[in-house]
Every structure is written in structure tokens, then in C-alpha cells.
Amino acid sequence: LCNPSNRRTPRGSWVGWQARYGSLKVGKRRFLQVIEDRGLDVVTQVFFDMQDYTEKGLREKIRALPDGVYYGEEWFEDDGITATPFGVRLSLIVDGDEIIFDFTRSDPQANGPINAPYVVTMSASLNALLYMIGGDLPVNAGLNRTVRIVTKAGTIRCVRLPGSSVGGQTESSPSLMG
């Protein structure tokens, strides 16, 4: 499950893993009980209904925004290896009930660990959108039906292997959320 010997805080890591594992076991047991009580078809339909609800709610909120293209930039002074600044450039396109986060103008990926994989860029973009307009909506796959995230492989917002990406989660991702 977890090898605590290669951690800076082995005891805390091990206790954390045990707690997560225990909560997953409880969640699994309770989820299976809901399926037994209600039936798999009903539970599955509820999942799809919740996604439809989220999509509809987010489309309504996006429609309330003025259509247009909005620009933003965030700069990192360096990547920890070179003294070169790196820019994240966003074109946010609002069109009716859809929204596009376009990061294709961002700088090429860095040698240092400030890059982000696509999934981190997607997650940060969706989180920013939820913070701005959708805080009351359930978080599920319905969000992805109205939002597109566009990046270019090999940039600091879509790192290509063997590029480093730890700072993409801890530094550049929060910068997208303001």
C-alpha cells in the first residue's frame, strides 16, 4: 500500500495512507449498500441526471456573461534553473453558453519544474470557473460539456515528457485561480 521508509515524515505518511484506505473501504461499503437498496439502474441514472443538471446550470451561468475574448497573463521570474521569465498566456473565449480556455500562446516548457501537465491545466481552469460563477453546482463530468481547454504540447501549460512538472501543481496552477 505505502512504503513509509522513503518519506520525510514516515509515521505521518503511513497514518495518512491508513486513513485514506479506511475511508475508501467505508465509502465502498456504503455505495454498494445504496446500489443494493435502490438498484444499479437507478443509481446509474442519478449519475447521468446530475451531469445533465450541472451542464444545464453552467450553460445558464455562462450565457449570463458577455460574449467576447478576454486576455490574461501570469509571469514566473524563473524556473529554478535559468533566470529566464516564463509566461502563461490565456485567451478566455465566451461564446453563448460555451467557454474556451486557450493557453496556446504560453511559453515553451521550461527545464525547471514550473510546467504543468494538461490535466492540471484543465483542473485549474475548471476550478477558476467554478470559483467565479458556478460555486453552487455539483462538480462532475457535466462541467466538461460546456468548457474546452486548449493547450499546445511542449508548453508550460502542457508539459511533454521528460519535462518536470511538480511546480505546475504547486505554483502555476494556483496562479490560474487568481
State the predicted function of each range.
Residues 1-58:
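N-terminal leader/propeptide and maturation segments of large enzyme subunits in energy/redox metabolism
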Residues 51, 55, 122-130:
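Short, hydrophobic/amphipathic alpha-helical packing segments
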Residues 3, 10, 20, 112-113, ...:
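Hydrophobic core positions in small helical hairpin nucleic-acid-binding modules
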Residues 13-16, 105-110:
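A generic structural motif
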